[in-house]
């Protein structure tokens, strides 16, 4: 980011200065200068960037002259299909999310839009049930409705791969305003670089074949546009834009990057991270990275029981205990203390004799512990109050992982009430970002997707971004 260099410089200067030098410096500062110093120190704490050193400020499609140009647009049309009839799409949300970028390109007079996506896991084989033919039909209906006239969407490479001379010729000189949808890019082994053969054996794509496949993509258009945040953490061929002179983001990806930039690059403070999920070991990198950035951290969900057993010796009964994750709990707590991060753990619980609502359900607390034969499936009322208090203090919130088994009504209070708290805070101008995955599912369940600042569409991508990793599909794009 633009602040990255200044943050590094500030961090180095702060680290090099002695206590006496810092005190002498502060004593001679004006109020305005003190405010700037505090800001620099906050930048130093946050690392001044999103992670991996890669900027999240990328060239957007609305900053590119696309009139008369052919646009290759990588989308995410990995839509849910009816199990009995795969030709039926059961939820068009991902198609709807791509429409603003497609419509913008057409309105700005582009020559053609060449859409590309994966669907399912065909593992480098042409699998009929994973054909994008139903997506082409749905896209045509939605684009035509938006335009009030028929907008044909032609599927290229139908029944096979799209890296053919026939497809290349079709895209070479299309009629103005043409919309093409390439057949499932994962039908090609060279897309992911690996897959299975007809006998089910694992195979890898030849490096030269991958290079040729990427070159074939670059022949289809003049400008590369990525609008598939959900696969931005994969260095798959159609995500990288190799061979394109201009590589920009679509509106969906731009929105994701802007939202995470607000949280990770010099956020308003206090910054609160809410982390849930089952295993500590699955979130080690996430926790460690966020401890360098946040002021408060709520640890809930199943992994909270591992923390409580290690730190306080609490009897957790049959609750989830992560043996591997337990090994680094003390290290995490020591880092939190070193970084002055307040860790908020549950102090009471809703427990059940079964993993379900048909067991004996009761409350437990730290003093009583969780009886043998019972497992913690949600946090209790006092924990809910403590979580609400943390949200009330925050100016920026990032949330990844539920507080309990919210799919069951008896164990949803921790997650549902916290969601209500976050929504209320958002009304008060707090920046709130939901980091995809199960928390995004909770947003959908409670109808709060539009009531938080941003609800991410990328589970794995958002997690890796929060872990401080570069996303190949983002790093490949041109800087703004």
What kind of feature is each model-predicted range?
Residues 5-51:
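Long, low-complexity, highly charged intrinsically disordered regions that are enriched for acidic
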Residues 50-480:
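Active-site loop-to-helix "anion-binding N-cap" substructures in soluble metabolic enzymes
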């Amino acid at each position: 980011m633009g602040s990255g260099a200044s943050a590094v410089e500030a961090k180095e200067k702060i680290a090099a200065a002695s206590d006496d030098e810092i005190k002498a410096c502060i004593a001679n500062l004006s109020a305005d200068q003190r405010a700037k110093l505090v800001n620099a120190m906050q930048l130093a704490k946050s690392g001044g960037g999103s992670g991996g050193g890669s900027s999240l400020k990328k060239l957007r499609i609305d900053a590119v002259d696309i009139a008369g140009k052919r646009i290759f647009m990588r989308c995410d049309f990995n839509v849910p299909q009816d199990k009995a009839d795969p030709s039926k799409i059961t939820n068009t949300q991902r198609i709807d999310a791509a429409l603003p970028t497609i419509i913008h390109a057409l309105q700005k007079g582009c020559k053609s839009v060449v859409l590309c996506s994966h669907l399912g896991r065909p593992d480098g084989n042409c699998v009929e049930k994973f054909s994008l033919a139903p997506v082409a039909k749905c896209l045509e209906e939605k684009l035509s409705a938006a335009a009030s006239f028929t907008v044909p969407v032609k599927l290229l490479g139908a029944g096979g791969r799209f890296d053919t001379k026939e497809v290349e010729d079709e895209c070479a000189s299309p009629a103005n305003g043409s919309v093409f949808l390439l057949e499932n890019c994962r039908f090609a082994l060279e897309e992911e670089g690996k897959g299975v053969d007809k006998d089910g054996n694992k195979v890898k794509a030849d490096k030269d074949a991958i290079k040729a496949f990427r070159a074939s993509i670059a022949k289809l258009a003049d400008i590369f546009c990525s609008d598939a945040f959900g696969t931005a953490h994969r260095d798959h061929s159609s995500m990288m834009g190799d061979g394109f002179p201009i590589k920009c983001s679509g509106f969906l990806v731009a929105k994701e990057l802007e939202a995470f930039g607000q949280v990770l690059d010099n956020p308003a403070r206090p910054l609160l991270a809410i982390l849930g999920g089952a295993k500590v070991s699955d979130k080690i990198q996430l926790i460690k990275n966020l401890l360098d950035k946040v002021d408060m951290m709520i640890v809930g969900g199943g992994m909270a029981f591992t923390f409580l057993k290690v730190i306080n010796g609490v009897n957790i009964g049959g609750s989830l205990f992560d043996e591997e994750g337990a090994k680094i709990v003390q290290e995490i707590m020591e880092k939190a203390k070193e970084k002055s991060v307040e860790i908020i753990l549950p102090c009471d619980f809703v427990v059940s004799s079964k993993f379900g609502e048909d067991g004996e359900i009761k409350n437990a607390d730290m003093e009583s512990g969780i009886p043998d034969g019972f497992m913690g499936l949600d946090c209790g009322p006092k924990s809910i109050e403590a979580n609400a208090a943390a949200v009330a203090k925050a100016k920026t919130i990032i949330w990844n992982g539920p507080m309990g088994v919210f799919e069951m009504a008896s164990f949803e209070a921790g997650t549902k009430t916290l969601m209500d708290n976050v929504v209320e805070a958002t009304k008060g101008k707090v920046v709130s970002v939901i980091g995809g995955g199960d928390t995004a599912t909770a947003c959908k369940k409670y109808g709060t997707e539009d009531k938080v600042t941003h609800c991410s569409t990328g589970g794995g991508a958002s997690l890796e971004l929060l872990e401080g990793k570069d996303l190949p599909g983002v790093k490949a794009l041109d800087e703004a």
